[in-house]
């Protein structure tokens, strides 16, 4: 019996080391929970960053809302771990996804977003090293640095939202509709975003992306955006 306990403990330790090597941000878990914030704290702490990287689609309140809904404004938020009965040993118990940071950016999204940046509230693409109008030093970006995460998400969502609306010739779309499309892209990916546009900018009842009900998620982000709009208005009035 003791031998089985030792073997199980060793297996968990080996798996833990492997998962940390694959996703080093798991090392933040002892302190991660202490960085959660209420909306007012998120706005107070990061409003200058949200405003700096805002675009016509991803306004500062919208960027704040996504950060609050995804991770309570926690810059090093991590996903939960789960069991999965797969034949590969290191697949048995592992983080639920590669997502990390206040926007829970996955590896795939991170790879695409790093080709973009925000200059003067507009999306700019990666270019030659000597092109001062292009993005530069993007390879040094990190999902757990708030200013990097905000810029990456703002650029990625704005670029994909504008591209999809242009592709399907959707004109006269309101800001709320554009932000809802950006929310779907953030939650489900650009492919689901394209389907959302084809469906008339409406979510299919019961549609899920991962563990999230799309319609419920859209409602949460929209409500949180309204809250951050009020906080921004209070700043302007003071």
Regions found by a protein language model. Name each.
Residues 1-17:
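Hydrophobic membrane-insertion alpha-helices, especially the h-region
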């Amino acid at each position: 019996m003791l031998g089985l306990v030792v073997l199980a403990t060793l297996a968990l330790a080996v798996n833990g080391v492997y998962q940390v090597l694959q996703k080093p941000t798991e090392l933040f878990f002892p302190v991660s929970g202490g960085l959660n914030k209420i909306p007012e704290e998120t706005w107070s702490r990061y409003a200058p960053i949200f405003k700096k990287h805002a675009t016509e689609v991803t306004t500062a309140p919208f960027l704040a809302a996504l950060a609050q809904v995804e991770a309570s404004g926690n810059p090093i938020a991590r996903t939960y771990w789960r069991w999965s009965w797969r034949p590969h040993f290191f697949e048995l118990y592992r983080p639920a996804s590669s997502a990390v940071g206040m926007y829970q950016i996955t590896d795939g999204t991170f790879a695409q977003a790093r080709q973009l940046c925000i200059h003067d509230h507009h999306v700019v693409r990666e270019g030659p090293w000597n092109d001062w109008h292009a993005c530069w030093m993007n390879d040094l970006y990190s999902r757990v640095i708030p200013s990097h995460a905000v810029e990456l998400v703002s650029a990625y969502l704005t670029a994909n939202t504008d591209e999809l609306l242009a592709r399907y010739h959707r004109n006269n779309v309101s800001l709320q509709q554009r932000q809802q499309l950006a929310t779907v892209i953030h939650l489900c990916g650009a492919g689901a975003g394209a389907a959302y546009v084809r469906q008339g900018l409406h979510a299919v009842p019961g549609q899920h992306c991962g563990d999230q009900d799309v319609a419920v998620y859209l409602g949460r982000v929209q409500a949180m955006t309204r809250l951050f709009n009020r906080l921004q208005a209070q700043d302007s009035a003071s």
